[in-house]
Amino acid sequence: MRISARLAVSLALLGACTPAPTSPTPDPRKVDEPVKQAPAPEPAREAPPVRKDGTIYAEAMQMGTRFSINLWLGDRPASEGGAAIEAALAEIERVEQIASEWRPTSELSQLNANAGGPMRPLSPELFELLQRSKVIAEATGGAFDPSFYGVGQLWKFDPGATPPKPEEISAKLHLVDWRAIELDPNTGQGRLQKPGMKLGLGAIAKGYGVDRAALVLVQRGFNNHIVEGGGDTYVSGTKAGKPWMVGIQRPDRPGSLAAIPSSDRAIVTSGDYQRFFEFQGKRYAHILDPATGWPIPEERSAQSVTVLAKDATDADAYATAVAVMGPEKGMAFVEAHPDLEAVIINRAGEVMVSKDLQPTLVWPPTKAPAGADDPARAPTKSP
């Protein structure tokens, strides 16, 4: 299960569209759904300058990472676009206050603190995120498991870090059990059945924040934009009538491996090479297997996994799951789910592309496709 970094992606110009597996929860980007009241943003800043291509760009540190918005104005004034971006960033702040395990005052932290206690009321959004998490956990056989956090807290991946002791992991491993997330749809209440159990929604909540920010922009009439948060990306519409393109960063060196034409879909990439440490000659990467509490063994891990889905919420969670499964099992899972697409780079550097994505992937002969060499790059996902 990923604790932190998500492989950087790069953004340029071109487009296509694919849906993601259905879930019993509402689409976080449903346009007719009213956006909840976000916390009052800071006083409005001056509108971002309009760039030569007719876009404005802004970024902010939220949910422990960098969120950015690239918005094509069309014939709208920059002041309106700037106000829409401010509102979208405020929406991300609101999501963080609900679903961040890092904020002691968040609703999720309060649920964690109540682990082993009685059922308690949950906000509709947290309830839906947990319900969706359970659906994906079951679909992936536990490769995605938000209850990993009880063990995940034992790991640090900063330079000079050391692994936890095996007995420390063994003592916490029984707390990793998505089935022990109890939800009552009739009352909207929930609880964690095991004392000491902790949820970490970093592998789904950032995607949800991206989706909600994109929804705010659409509701304000800005249908052409890219919202990115720590490597979780949602691409909406086009830029000046030309589809956007997302470039897949090479895991071994700077530059784009290939580019994916994208419009009205999400693209999320997970990689194990950006956040790791070495101890006594062994490499420990940040992607943890919920079944063992240890990082994925290097011999069965992928260098990077890119997953495409209808929204960033699903793509976020499925990218984690496929990375945990490993290249062969992960690609087989994707091929068995028509609403997912993937690009996987295995440990040997071989590139695996899901069947339906192969015709649309742009393979430059010697360099990234035109326009993809100077993209807005997603940052390393923060822990």
Where are the model-predicted features located?
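Mature catalytic core of soluble alpha/beta enzymes
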Residues: 2-11, 15-383
